[in-house]
Amino acid sequence: MFLKKLKLTNFKCLSNIELSFEKTKTENRKWTLILGENGTGKSNILKSIALVTSGSNALGELLGNTDSWIKFNEKSCSIQAELETKKGEERNISLQFNRGDNLSKIISNNRESLHLIDDAIENADRNYFVVAYGASRRLSNEVFSNFEKSRNGRSINVRNLFDSASTLNPLTAWIIELDYRSGKEGINLVKEALKDFLPGITFHSIDKEKKQVLFETVDGIIPLDQLSDGYQNMAAWIGDLLFRITETFKDYKKPLEARGLLLIDEVDLHLHPKWQRRLLDFIGTKLLNFQVVATTHSPLTAQQADSGELFALKRSDNNIVELVPFQGSPKSLLVNQLLMTPVFGLETDESYEVQQAKEEYEALKSKGDSLSSSDKEKMKEVKRKLKTKLPKRKAPSSSDKEIALLQKIETKLNIKK
């Protein structure tokens, strides 16, 4: 299944949002990144996708208070989506919630769309496979506590997006279970999945007696639970995701090549900038046939998006949230250039203190001859501050290696001419 189009009407704070996931008329986009200030509804877009693809049983477990999904002062809300099956067939599905409706009324009113999902799931539970993660991605303290509980229920695959208190299946549990079930073949899958998993560490082995997964680091062989918080946060959802894929597609020789939809809120949470720059490539390489819809606040992550993959939620002058596509390719911009595009909305790449000092100076300067003596003293003070605080910009320079590479490319181009 691939998601082709999404339309939201009065869903939470989103009055009227339309988003196409088509790269071309014949090809769907693999990546969609959504930016936006807090409170503009980034997470709500992910939740709407999870709800409309959930099916009857899961919907009842995820929905909670029906009225909470409807925009304030509105009587109803709707989610409309267009999907494409593995066979290339189009499916139009939708959900509508009316204020005051209970769960049975909602299921009755949306019977036709839910029937499409339910039939597909009944045929094979892995049809329309969707996994979702919220911004709070916590590991269980007990290695196998949630591991056994999570074997049933389609809603479990997206629960973390809706419930910040929900915990994930530990990476340790997945690896030990896979080793027990599949032996050497399982360990090879682990090695392949975790290759380039995190910078500076590699999977080493399993300590079966202590029920620990060991990683090789610059500081020696260290168990997963002793790695940094950033590594463990990444391990939390990556481990849970790998578990769900291999459990669902356990009859596949290469389960990581299965098709599916991954929804993840704040995809780069707690990650060092070096790893943020590699994250999209890692996910795309490991999950070749997954479609990914993610939110981010990071310009480093946004910079990895290709043309047509980056969008921003912005509030208009009349406080309506609008979806703004990024014009051009983020990959072609420097990070500071990207920060000052409309999708991020920064006016300068200088510090807030310097920006304030400049504005104060311009305000004083605009007074012209009407400057008071105290204004003149203030102006001198602001000038001194700017002189010491204003960053010095250097002309961009290239290293000897970069110059040599450019010369080599130029030589090859001349030969081709």
Each model region followed by its residue ranges:
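Conserved P-loop NTP-binding catalytic core
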Residues: L46-S104
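Conserved H-loop
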Residues: T296-H297
